[in-house]
Amino acid sequence: MESVRQQKVARLILKEMADIFLKESRVLFGNVFISITVVRMSPDLSVAKLYLSIMLQEDKNAILKEIKVHTKELRKLLGERIRKQVRIIPEIIFYLDDNVDYANHMDDVLSKITIPKKEDENFDPNQYPGLKE
């Protein structure tokens, strides 16, 4: 469980990095929409793990690699914004958050399931024992 301080610093980093990605991503990464879904801080506040959701792009891993190339530059921009609020600027580690893709996949799977209605002539109550009358 994260401490209150970890949560505060994580929220601060999320807010500032989201603003940095909003303003700088077009210059650095082209026409890609990058959002930060979660920030996790280490107990000593020296490492921030940022989970990114990358949209409008097919090859998300290529964009993630490009982001990792610019990690120093992004950390410098973050440091300029939060240096008076934290003692040390944390090391930034980026991860790809695939929860949105997984949710879309599960939505597709669930939409393909067809359960006949009780009024349907093909309905067999023995085939669906969990359904109540």
Swiss-Prot record:
Keywords associated with the record: Cytoplasm, Ribosome biogenesis
Organism: Cytophaga hutchinsonii (strain ATCC 33406 / DSM 1761 / CIP 103989 / NBRC 15051 / NCIMB 9469 / D465)
Residues annotated as signal peptide: none
Name the UniProt record assigns to this protein: Ribosome-binding factor A
Keyword rRNA-binding listed: no
GO function terms (MF aspect): ribosomal small subunit binding
A GO biological-process term: maturation of SSU-rRNA
Recorded family membership: Belongs to the RbfA family.
Superkingdom as given in the UniProt entry: Bacteria
Coarse class of the protein's main subcellular location: cytoplasm
Gene3D superfamilies hit by this protein: 3.30.300.20
Function noted in UniProt: One of several proteins that assist in the late maturation steps of the functional core of the 30S ribosomal subunit. Associates with free 30S ribosomal subunits (but not with 30S subunits that are part of 70S ribosomes or polysomes). Required for efficient processing of 16S rRNA. May interact with the 5'-terminal helix region of 16S rRNA.
Subunit structure: Monomer. Binds 30S ribosomal subunits, but not 50S ribosomal subunits or 70S ribosomes.
GO CC term (a single one): cytosol
Subcellular compartments: Cytoplasm
One Pfam family in the UniProt entry: RBFA
InterPro entries recorded: KH_dom-like_a/b (IPR015946), RbfA (IPR000238), RbfA_dom_sf (IPR023799)
